[in-house]
């Protein structure tokens, strides 16, 4: 019996991870990695693929069964031509990757990008900004040693990235390396010889791959927008880096600030300081700001952030140079490129966006939780709990129930109060349902909209393989369906089950539920396990009103079922001449 599957798309752009050892050096070779993985048992269960995908036009790969997971991770790989050394990566390559993800976004639960390590952090930062309203995991990884070597971090990195992309609700661009998952726009390469090549200096990893996989769900950045996923494929090329150093020549500074430069990342000493006696440099910076150039002040230090409470840092701030908080140089540069390319924003808006935390790229002061939830302390006293570990387990047990209770009642104020007290709105209950499932099932439009603005996932499937959109369909709530669809939600159930649902509606003559399925994006000609469509059932039931309803919505009278019968043939056999006449006038659906 075929297992439940999680489908992942892998984009192989190049890099050490897929190289071959030739004449004493590692070299990229077209199609080498694709063929090599096919024979690596840790990366591909060939028996499973041969059993269930023998007739597939493009055969996928499949990870061996994972401990504590019922899903099989099935993945397809696209190899770029030519394979790119990461040192050759350009803005156009970032756009290429983004567009590839956009084209395949609805077909996969997550994405993995195989990339060379040298500019991997730049690509991760760029994609984090270009990919707007992301609600699926996009994991970038690479290697210090190729996948096919006996000693290889590439093999473990690829497996870990696939597991994250297939199984975890981490809807942002991340970097996976050496058993740690980092936010993409917080990552820097720190070592070219160690397996610990990457670090996130100002933020703890989102997840650790130890004996157990530990995810810090509170640190995940979730899109606050209700808009659907889109790729912003324009980037401003007129940006640069200006690193301050002692006795720097004014000509060097002037050259870095001249038009057509529109944005500069100024890398200063310590907490954002530069020589206070260098009025010539300050004058050049002021001229650039006055002509509309956006300058971001970032520290040359690996850790820490810009502090405008020092005199020289305050001077820069007062002249209009924007403090970059704890952004990395890679994040600041790619964010500048992204923000400057937004022609719909005025200069003031662009500057405001550079200060704002738009993808989790910088640290902003967080309000402390208003108070500890009284129910937690009361239950802890009742159960005689005292240790922090016991309290944590208690919170994990009751928070999902509190969230689902609030969602089922449409209690937005309670949802807000829970969120303000540090509760992760994306947690799931014992049925694998999140608050969005529950709010949609109860028909609470306001609660659904609030949860969407807090980044709660509508892609998440419960133990019945249903997402929030399916819950809304069952409620027959048109407004809810439109709300979720406009945010990018798609039906989660498989095609055969969808066919059964449509045929069941037809057997009852239930046009209201049919309307809901169609509004949610269902194909009116979807077939059930016998190959029958809703139109087959309607004709066989002699329900002429329903037949006309379905034909008005492009149902195909020529669709052949497993018994080689069409709705038209059924109508002829039942002598329903008026239906036969109408069906013959219709064209066959391609």
Curated annotation (Swiss-Prot):
<dbReference type="InterPro" id="IPR027474">
    <property type="entry name" value="L-asparaginase_N"/>
</dbReference>
<feature type="binding site">
    <location>
        <begin position="117"/>
        <end position="118"/>
    </location>
    <ligand>
        <name>substrate</name>
    </ligand>
</feature>
<dbReference type="InterPro" id="IPR027475">
    <property type="entry name" value="Asparaginase/glutaminase_AS2"/>
</dbReference>
<protein>
    <recommendedName>
        <fullName>L-asparaginase</fullName>
        <ecNumber>3.5.1.1</ecNumber>
    </recommendedName>
</protein>
<dbReference type="InterPro" id="IPR037152">
    <property type="entry name" value="L-asparaginase_N_sf"/>
</dbReference>
<dbReference type="InterPro" id="IPR006034">
    <property type="entry name" value="Asparaginase/glutaminase-like"/>
</dbReference>
<keyword id="KW-0677">Repeat</keyword>
<feature type="repeat" description="ANK 1">
    <location>
        <begin position="398"/>
        <end position="427"/>
    </location>
</feature>
<keyword id="KW-0040">ANK repeat</keyword>
<feature type="repeat" description="ANK 4">
    <location>
        <begin position="530"/>
        <end position="559"/>
    </location>
</feature>
<dbReference type="InterPro" id="IPR040919">
    <property type="entry name" value="Asparaginase_C"/>
</dbReference>
<dbReference type="InterPro" id="IPR020827">
    <property type="entry name" value="Asparaginase/glutaminase_AS1"/>
</dbReference>
<feature type="binding site">
    <location>
        <begin position="85"/>
        <end position="87"/>
    </location>
    <ligand>
        <name>substrate</name>
    </ligand>
</feature>
<dbReference type="InterPro" id="IPR041725">
    <property type="entry name" value="L-asparaginase_I"/>
</dbReference>
<feature type="domain" description="Asparaginase/glutaminase">
    <location>
        <begin position="6"/>
        <end position="357"/>
    </location>
</feature>
<dbReference type="InterPro" id="IPR036770">
    <property type="entry name" value="Ankyrin_rpt-contain_sf"/>
</dbReference>
<dbReference type="Pfam" id="PF00710">
    <property type="entry name" value="Asparaginase"/>
</dbReference>
<comment type="similarity">
    <text>In the N-terminal section; belongs to the asparaginase 1 family.</text>
</comment>
<feature type="repeat" description="ANK 2">
    <location>
        <begin position="431"/>
        <end position="460"/>
    </location>
</feature>
<feature type="active site" description="O-isoaspartyl threonine intermediate">
    <location>
        <position position="16"/>
    </location>
</feature>
<keyword id="KW-0378">Hydrolase</keyword>
<dbReference type="GO" id="GO:0004067">
    <property type="term" value="F:asparaginase activity"/>
</dbReference>
<dbReference type="InterPro" id="IPR036152">
    <property type="entry name" value="Asp/glu_Ase-like_sf"/>
</dbReference>
<dbReference type="Pfam" id="PF13637">
    <property type="entry name" value="Ank_4"/>
</dbReference>
<dbReference type="InterPro" id="IPR006033">
    <property type="entry name" value="AsnA_fam"/>
</dbReference>
<feature type="repeat" description="ANK 3">
    <location>
        <begin position="497"/>
        <end position="526"/>
    </location>
</feature>
<dbReference type="InterPro" id="IPR002110">
    <property type="entry name" value="Ankyrin_rpt"/>
</dbReference>
<dbReference type="InterPro" id="IPR027473">
    <property type="entry name" value="L-asparaginase_C"/>
</dbReference>
<dbReference type="GO" id="GO:0006528">
    <property type="term" value="P:asparagine metabolic process"/>
</dbReference>
<dbReference type="Pfam" id="PF17763">
    <property type="entry name" value="Asparaginase_C"/>
</dbReference>
<feature type="region of interest" description="Asparaginase">
    <location>
        <begin position="44"/>
        <end position="351"/>
    </location>
</feature>
């Amino acid at each position: 019996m075929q297992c439940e599957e999680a489908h992942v798309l892998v984009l192989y752009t190049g890099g050490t991870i897929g190289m071959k050892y030739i004449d004493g050096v590692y070299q990229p070779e077209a199609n080498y990695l694709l063929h090599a993985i096919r024979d690596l048992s840790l990366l591909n269960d060939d028996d499973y693929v041969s059993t269930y995908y023998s007739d597939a036009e493009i055969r996928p790969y499949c990870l061996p069964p994972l401990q504590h997971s019922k899903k099989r991770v099935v993945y397809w790989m696209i190899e770029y031509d030519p394979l790119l050394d990461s040192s050759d990566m350009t803005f156009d390559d970032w756009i290429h990757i983004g567009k590839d993800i956009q084209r395949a976004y609805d077909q996969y639960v997550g994405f993995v990008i195989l990339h060379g390590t040298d500019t991997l952090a730049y690509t991760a930062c760029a994609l984090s900004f270009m990919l707007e309203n992301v609600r699926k995991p996009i994991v970038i990884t690479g290697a210090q040693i190729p996948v096919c070597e006996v000693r290889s971090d590439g093999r473990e990195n690829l497996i870990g990235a696939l597991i994250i992309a297939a199984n975890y609700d981490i809807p942002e661009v991340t970097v996976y390396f050496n058993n740690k998952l980092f936010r993409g726009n917080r990552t820097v390469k720190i070592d070219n010889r160690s397996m610990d090549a990457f670090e996130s200096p100002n933020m703890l990893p989102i997840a650790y791959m130890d004996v157990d996989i530990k995810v810090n769900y509170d640190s995940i950045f979730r899109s606050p927008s209700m808009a659907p996923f889109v790729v912003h494929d324009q980037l401003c090329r007129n940006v640069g880096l200006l690193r301050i150093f002692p006795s720097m020549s004014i000509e060097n500074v002037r050259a870095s600030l001249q038009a057509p430069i529109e944005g500069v990342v100024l890398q200063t000493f310590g907490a954002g300081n530069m020589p206070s006696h260098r009025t010539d440099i300050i004058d050049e910076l002021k001229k650039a700001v006055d002509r509309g150039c956006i300058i971001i002040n970032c520290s040359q230090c690996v850790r820490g952030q810009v502090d405008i409470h020092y005199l020289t840092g305050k001077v820069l701030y007062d002249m209009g140079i924007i403090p970059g908080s704890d952004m990395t140089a890679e994040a600041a540069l790619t964010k500048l490129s992204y923000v400057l390319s937004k022609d719909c924003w005025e200069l003031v808006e662009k500057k405001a966006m550079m200060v704002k935390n738009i993808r989790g790229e910088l640290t902003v002061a967080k309000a402390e939780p208003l108070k500890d939830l009284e129910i937690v302390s009361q239950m802890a006293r009742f159960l005689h709990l005292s240790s922090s570990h016991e309290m944590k387990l208690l919170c994990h047990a009751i928070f999902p129930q509190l969230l689902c209770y609030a969602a089922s009642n449409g209690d937005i104020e309670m949802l807000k109060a829970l969120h303000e007290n540090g509760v992760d709105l994306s947690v799931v209950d014992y049925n694998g349902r999140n608050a969005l499932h529950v709010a949609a099932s109860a028909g609470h439009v306001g609660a659904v909209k609030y949860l969407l603005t807090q980044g709660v996932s509508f892609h998440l499937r419960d133990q019945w393989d249903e997402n929030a959109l399916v819950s809304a369909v069952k409620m027959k709530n048109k407004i809810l369906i439109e709300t979720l669809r406009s945010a990018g939600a798609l039906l989660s159930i498989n095609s055969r089950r969808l066919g059964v649902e449509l045929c069941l509606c037809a057997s009852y003559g239930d046009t209201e539920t049919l309307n809901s399925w169609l509004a949610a994006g269902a194909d009116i000609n979807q077939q059930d396990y016998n190959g029958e469509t809703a139109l087959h059932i309607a004709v066989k039931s002699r329900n002429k009103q329903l037949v006309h309803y379905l034909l008005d919505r492009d149902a195909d009278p020529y669709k052949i079922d497993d018994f080689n019968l069409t709705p038209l043939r059924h109508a002829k056999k039942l002598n329903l001449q008026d239906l036969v006449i109408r069906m013959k006038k219709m064209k066959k659906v391609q």
